[in-house]
């Protein structure tokens, strides 16, 4: 590091008006010099640091989403403790970089000497696999999810004091390094239609209202509580700022109010009051939006509210993780919710809640999936509040998940109710929730853990309840059909001791007692 140190010293002497740093993304060790030696720390010549992680107490401490989004979704996380250990201003390095499924409508824009053979290869592969018509939906759904992740990343930075700033790698795609389509704009700087500029400015503007809430999913017997604060990076402090708040669902206004006026100095983490809302008036599963407005500044967040106990009218519905029991019920014309364990899925693909980072081709040590494409108008999801793309209420269902079912070999004509968007380097048809007629029976398959322990989670309970209610009331058989042999192609029995979760035919399906 002697050359950069010498160069910086010369530049600082030649032009002291500017601030200089020798590197970015260096993973500096910031322990006390007596522990590590001064040579391990950033050069004294550096005026500031640009890092995505630093070494503290022998551990790498991350400062962007990958280090935080593997835990229950919340808006309380920050990296203040990391910043407290540094003695120089620090900016986070290239936050975001969430991959969006390539926009194939970009192909005709290449009219010069460069040919987009990567996009052409993806297009041809999708066509071969019968998925080409879904490509625009893959781009839109993965892009909407990426936009939400960018919002969460920026807010994570704004909640961290005294952070000097954050860097986004870019807002447009990088066509190289394995096709790194990580932007809201394509390689030609044209919008993909996945991010609303006004909504993005709410979180990337000069004054940003923020909330700290411990989770995103609530039950209706709880009280929603959040702390309000501001990040003010405008030109001046703000005096007597009054904040209006409201919590609203598609069914109407849940609650509203105003916080006492406060002064907002420059910088981040300035408290502005607290909100408490009893949720007992919410009588059905819903998604609600909390909105804060303070003058021209505005910001909003979604939360999900579900009943504390999902009552299931399971009359005529059999719920089981056992392939043997599912097939036996189907032969009797039963309505079955089959929830296979990871080991039971023969044709499976690892999944993750988060989309792949940068590119599934460049970084191959990740699941590579790119979020969900959801038929949120399907009656199977009538009691499970969801948009048509991944959002925070899916985190607990996908973390962990048995994986997605690869449907390429059974050629179902219908799209899955909940489809996992595969990496563009594979382009498999992946089902998380899908249905088929099996003989005279109606089968819904959900690759999620509905064990007793897992059902402590409100969203898992609600998803199971919604699927069971759909099966109990459905009067139209699925258009697709699977044979018993095709089920064996996709799944396998994994234990003689598999137990049903609920099924009125459970006793009929128990093996006969051994002969004496």
Label every model-predicted segment.
Residues 66-77, 342-346, 358-458, 475-516:
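Catalytic beta-strand/loop cores that center a nucleophilic Ser/Cys/Thr
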Residues 222-262, 272-278, 284-294:
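Beta-strand-rich binding/interaction modules
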Residues 315-360, 440-442, 467:
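Short alpha-beta junction capping motif
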Residues 304-322, 478, 482:
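Low-complexity, Pro/Ser/Thr- and charge-rich linker/hinge segments at domain boundaries
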Residues 14, 169-234, 495:
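Aromatic-rich peripheral "rim/lid" segments of glycoside hydrolase catalytic domains that contact
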Residues 26-28, 96-99, 172-174, 229, ...:
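Short, solvent-exposed loop/turn segments at secondary-structure junctions
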Residues 295-300:
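Short, exposed coil/turn segments at beta-strand boundaries within extracellular/luminal domains
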Residues 1-185:
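Substrate-binding/catalytic cleft of secreted carbohydrate-active enzymes
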């Amino acid at each position: 590091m002697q050359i950069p140190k010498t160069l910086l010293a010369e530049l600082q002497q030649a032009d002291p008006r500017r601030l200089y740093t020798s590197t970015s993304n260096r993973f500096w060790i910031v322990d006390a010099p007596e522990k590590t030696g001064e040579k391990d720390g950033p050069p004294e010549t550096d005026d500031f640091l640009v890092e995505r992680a630093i070494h503290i107490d022998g551990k790498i401490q991350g400062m962007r989403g990958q280090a935080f989004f593997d835990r229950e979704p919340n808006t309380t996380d920050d990296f203040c403790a990391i910043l407290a250990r540094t003695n120089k201003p620090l900016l986070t390095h290239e936050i975001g970089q969430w991959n969006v499924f390539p926009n194939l409508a970009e192909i005709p824009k290449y009219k010069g000497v460069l040919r987009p053979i990567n996009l052409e290869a993806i297009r041809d592969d999708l066509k071969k696999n019968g998925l080409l018509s879904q490509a625009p939906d893959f781009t839109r759904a993965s892009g909407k999810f990426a936009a939400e992740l960018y919002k969460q990343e920026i807010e994570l930075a704004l909640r961290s004091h005294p952070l000097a700033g954050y860097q986004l790698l870019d807002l447009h795609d990088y066509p190289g390094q394995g096709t790194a389509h990580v932007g809201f704009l394509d390689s030609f700087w044209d919008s993909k239609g996945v991010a609303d500029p006004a909504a993005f400015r709410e979180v990337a503007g000069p004054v940003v209202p923020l909330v700290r809430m411990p989770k995103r999913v609530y039950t209706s017997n709880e009280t929603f509580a959040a702390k309000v604060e501001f990040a003010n990076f405008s030109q001046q402090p703000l005096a007597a700022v009054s904040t209006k708040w409201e919590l609203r669902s598609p069914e109407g206004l849940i609650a509203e109010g105003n916080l006492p006026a406060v002064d907002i100095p420059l910088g981040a983490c300035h408290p502005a009051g607290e909100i408490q809302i009893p949720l007992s008036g919410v009588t059905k599963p819903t998604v609600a939006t909390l909105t804060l407005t303070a003058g021209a500044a505005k910001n909003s967040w979604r939360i999900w509210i579900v009943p504390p106990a999902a009552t299931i009218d399971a009359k005529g519905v059999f719920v089981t993780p056992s392939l043997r029991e599912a097939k036996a019920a189907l032969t009797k014309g039963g309505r079955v919710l089959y929830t296979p364990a990871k080991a039971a899925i023969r044709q499976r693909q690892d999944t993750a809640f988060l989309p792949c980072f940068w590119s599934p081709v460049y970084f191959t040590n990740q699941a590579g999936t790119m979020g969900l494409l959801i038929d949120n108008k399907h009656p199977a999801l009538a009691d499970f509040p969801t948009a048509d793309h991944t959002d925070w209420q899916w985190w607990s269902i996908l973390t962990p998940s048995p994986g997605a079912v690869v449907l390429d070999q059974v050629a179902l004509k219908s799209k899955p109710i909940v489809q996992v968007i595969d990496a563009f380097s594979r382009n498999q048809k992946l089902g998380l929730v899908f249905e088929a007629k099996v003989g005279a029976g109606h089968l819904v398959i959900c690759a999620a853990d509905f064990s007793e322990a897992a059902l402590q989670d409100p969203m898992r309970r609600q998803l199971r309840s919604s699927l069971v209610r759909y099966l109990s009331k459905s009067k139209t058989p699925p258009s697709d059909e699977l044979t018993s042999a095709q089920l064996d192609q996709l799944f396998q029995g994994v234990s003689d001791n598999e137990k049903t979760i609920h099924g009125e035919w459970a006793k009929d399906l128990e093996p006969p007692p051994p002969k004496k």
